[in-house]
Amino acid sequence: MFERIKVKKLNDHIYLMDDDGEATGYLVVGDKKALVIDTMNGYENVYDVVRTLTDLPLMVVNTHGHCDHIFGNVYFDEAYMNPDDSEVAKDHMAFQEFVESCKERNLYMPPFKPIKDADVIDLGGLTLDIISLPGHTPGGICLLLKEDRILFTGDGINHELWMQLNESKMLKDLLNNLDKIMYVTKEADFILHGHAHGVDNISLITELRDGVADLIETKGEGDKDYDWFGGVDKQHPFGDGKSAICYSIDKL
């Protein structure tokens, strides 16, 4: 039915939406309303996808302001995001390809409404706590689904953490911010991140935290190059060695 977005049911109220392997969004369905976490690239109508799964009133929350997490907002009336990522989102929304695509399809980005650390979303029977995690971007957030003990992390915690971007925080700041939220390891058992195909153990956050600390201590000595569309930076392995923190030298 849909060419790009493939839906995977994780339990009776959580759905993973895989946008052609490029980004992942989620739908959490409560008793009174449903929450869309990240709307992905916007090439395909994610609203229509969601409406095949629930007819409840919808709320959209973006974990951060990057294009592969917000461009699908064009199919909704409003979305919530941490205002600290407003400039990031503004820059991405100015991408020529996106501007031209919206014009051709008569689509518009809806306004962002603010959401902040310690806010609580009540879906009816399911509650999510907003947890600030500046790092990958200045306004990144996580969402803790308390009843299922699941932490949605966007790109702030994953197996290939991008810290080489202009908007990314210094690595010492990321370490400090990770230390502030380590309490979640006692409140969640699993992680669902912004490019996942399934769940990760909550231990990923500890592995990442220790990896950042090791990177700072070693100053990246011996780290290999990391080639990406923005140039060549560095990558520091963590955890089982298959995960990496991608960073630029000026973030050390």
Question: Can you name each region flagged by the protein language model?
Answer:
Residues G42-I121, L208-E221:
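Active-site HxH/HxHxD metal-binding segment of metal-dependent hydrolases
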Residues E3-T52, L143-N158:
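Conserved beta-strand hairpin/beta-sheet module of binuclear metal-dependent hydrolase folds
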